[in-house]
Regions:
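A generic structural motif
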Residues: 87-91
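Acidic, gly/pro-rich intrinsically disordered regions characteristic
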Residues: 1-16, 21-24, 72-82, 94-108, ...
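A broadly used, surface-exposed interaction patch
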Residues: 47-84
Length: 180
C-alpha cells in the first residue's frame, strides 16, 4: 500500500492556501484523504519517483539541481490501483542504501507527496471527525520514511511469499536430487 483513505492531522501551514482559508499556521487540522478523490488520483501516481526523503519535485528543479537526483532511489510502477481503503502500486527500489533501510525496517514506511485542493468543510469518516477534505489529488512522489502519517500499514511489502527460482529448482531433476 502506498497511501490510504483516512483522517490524518496536518498543521495549518502544511495545508495549501492556508492563509487564504483563514487557517492558523500552528493549529492542527484533521483532513480526510477522501476515498473518491484518492481513487480518481490513482493514475497520477504511476511512474512517479521514490525518494529517500520528502522534497517537492518539479520538472524544473529536478533538471536544475543535481543533488535532487541523488535522492531518487526508485520508481512507482505503472500498475496503481485503489482497493479501498488503500492505494496500491508496484514499487522498484534500486538504490543499495534504500534497500538496506527497507530490509532493516529503518525506512520501511511510505509517505506520498501530492498536490491537492483543500475543502474545509467538517464531517466524519468511519467514525473519525475531520475539519476538511483533500480534493483534486495529484501525485508528486513517494518517500521512504521511518514513520509515515498514513500509518504503519502503508509500507514497502513483498506481496509474493514464494521463491519461484527455488520452486523451479525443486521440480527439476537436479533440484529433486539436491532437495531430496
Amino acid at each position: 500500500h502506498i497511501s490510504k483513505a483516512t483522517v490524518n492531522p496536518y498543521c495549518g501551514k502544511e495545508i495549501p492556501g492556508y492563509e487564504a482559508l483563514g487557517l492558523q499556521p500552528d493549529k492542527v487540522y484533521r483532513l480526510l484523504r477522501d476515498p473518491v478523490e484518492l481513487e480518481r488520483a490513482a493514475d497520477t501516481f504511476k511512474r512517479n519517483y521514490i525518494l529517500s526523503k520528502h522534497v517537492p519535485l518539479t520538472v524544473t528543479n529536478i533538471a536544475d539541481d543535481p543533488k535532487l537526483k541523488l535522492l531518487i532511489v526508485g520508481s512507482i510502477g505503472s500498475d496503481v490501483e485503489f482497493k479501498p481503503p488503500y492505494l496500491d502500486a508496484d514499487l522498484c527500489v534500486w538504490d543499495a542504501t534504500a534497500i538496506a533501510g527497507i530490509e532493516t525496517d529503518k525506512v520501511r514506511e511510505l509517505s506520498c507527496a501530492y498536490r491537492y485542493v483543500p475543502v474545509m468543510e467538517p464531517g466524519e469518516f468511519e467514525g473519525q471527525p475531520y475539519d476538511g477534505r483533500m480534493t483534486e489529488i495529484q501525485g508528486n512522489h513517494l518517500a521512504l520514511v521511518e514513520v509515515g502519517r498514513a500509518g504503519s500499514d502503508v509500507v514497502v511489502a513483498d506481496r509474493n511469499p514464494f521463491n519461484f527460482k527455488e520452486t523451479a529448482m525443486k521440480m527439476s531433476k537436479l533440484g529433486k536430487a539436491l532437495f531430496a
